[in-house]
Amino acid sequence: MSSFILKFLWLEKSVAVGLDQKIGDRTTPVTEFFFWPQHDAWEEMKNFLEDKSWIDQSEVVILLNQITEVINYWQEKTELQKRDISHLTEKFPNVVFVGFD
């Protein structure tokens, strides 16, 4: 079971990802939100994760793969499709979508 949760802001012009750590029944933010495509959110998260020796390498791979899947999915959608968010939690059950526009 992962001790981390990826949180996404699903926006029309960008998608952002932040990382929280599970502590008991609660979560606490570990990172700020990294935005795509204004910046390279994936690369920024990769650099952050690689600098943290307390995050297991296998966990890093899983988190980066999940980020890749969500960003790729976001990029494939038209602006109209990006507004239809009802299916996101089904498609990506291991992440949390915390904001939309």
Curated annotation (Swiss-Prot):
Its main location: plastid. GO terms for cellular component: chloroplast; ribonucleoprotein complex; ribosome. Keywords: Chloroplast, Plastid, Ribonucleoprotein, Ribosomal protein. It holds the Pfam family PSRP-3_Ycf65. GO terms for molecular function: structural constituent of ribosome. It is found in: Plastid, Chloroplast. InterPro entries: PSRP-3/Ycf65_sf, Ribosomal_PSRP3/Ycf65. GO terms for biological process: translation. HAMAP family: Ribosomal_plastid_cS23. Part of the 30S ribosomal subunit. Belongs to the chloroplast-specific ribosomal protein cS23 family. PANTHER family: 30S RIBOSOMAL PROTEIN 3, CHLOROPLASTIC, OS04G0461100 PROTEIN. Probably a ribosomal protein or a ribosome-associated protein. This is Small ribosomal subunit protein cS23. It comes from Euglena stellata.
